[in-house]
């Protein structure tokens, strides 16, 4: 018998407590929406039906990282949860309208500036279509979690972006590791 995927609905307080204990918010919204406003350190995983999103998560994030899904109605969080669980992740549940709930609880959502000229260190995470240049630091997004500490915390970082999916995930990883000055450069 086939079972329908599910994701427990969490109150924002439950979700925030889980994140305080080490879980991560996963933002399922379109990349443009994520870059415009998001919870600092939340991880952008564009929801797409099929194996793409969950495979990207498996390649880029530790399986030991518990996940809390954020959605504003653009994706199907139950299917996203099922896909992520199928790759070995623990999905604690989902929060509807999480970014607004974060702000209502006194959190300060952040925006990621999209720049036309790079500022500070240029980071090439392997985003298809990006043209980061010869001087870019190359850390593929699937290695960034393990190598983010190699980057100086107080240094401005510009992530070279093509299509943006990997670049947006890199923004969240960098923020999670304490990098506050992160921009995206559409270099493609």
Give the label of every model feature segment.
Residues 1-188:
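Cytosolic catalytic domains that perform sulfur/thiol-centered chemistry
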């Amino acid at each position: 018998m086939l079972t329908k995927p599910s994701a427990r609905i969490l109150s924002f307080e439950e979700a925030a407590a889980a994140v305080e204990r080490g879980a991560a918010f996963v933002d399922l919204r379109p990349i443009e929406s994520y870059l415009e406003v998001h919870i600092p350190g939340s991880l952008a995983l564009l929801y797409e039906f099929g194996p793409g999103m969950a495979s990207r998560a498996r390649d880029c994030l530790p399986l030991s990282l518990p996940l809390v899904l954020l959605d504003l109605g653009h994706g199907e969080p139950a299917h996203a949860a099922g896909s992520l669980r199928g790759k070995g992740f623990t999905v604690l549940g989902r929060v509807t309208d999480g970014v607004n709930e974060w702000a209502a609880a006194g959190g300060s959502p952040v925006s990621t500036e999209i720049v036309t000229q790079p500022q500070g260190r240029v980071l090439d995470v392997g985003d298809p279509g990006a043209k980061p240049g010869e001087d870019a630091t190359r850390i593929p997004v699937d290695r960034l979690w393990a190598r983010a500490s190699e980057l100086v915390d107080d240094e401005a970082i510009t992530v070279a972006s093509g299509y943006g999916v990997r670049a947006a995930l890199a923004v969240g990883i960098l923020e999670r590791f304490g990098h506050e000055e992160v921009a995206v450069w559409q270099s493609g």
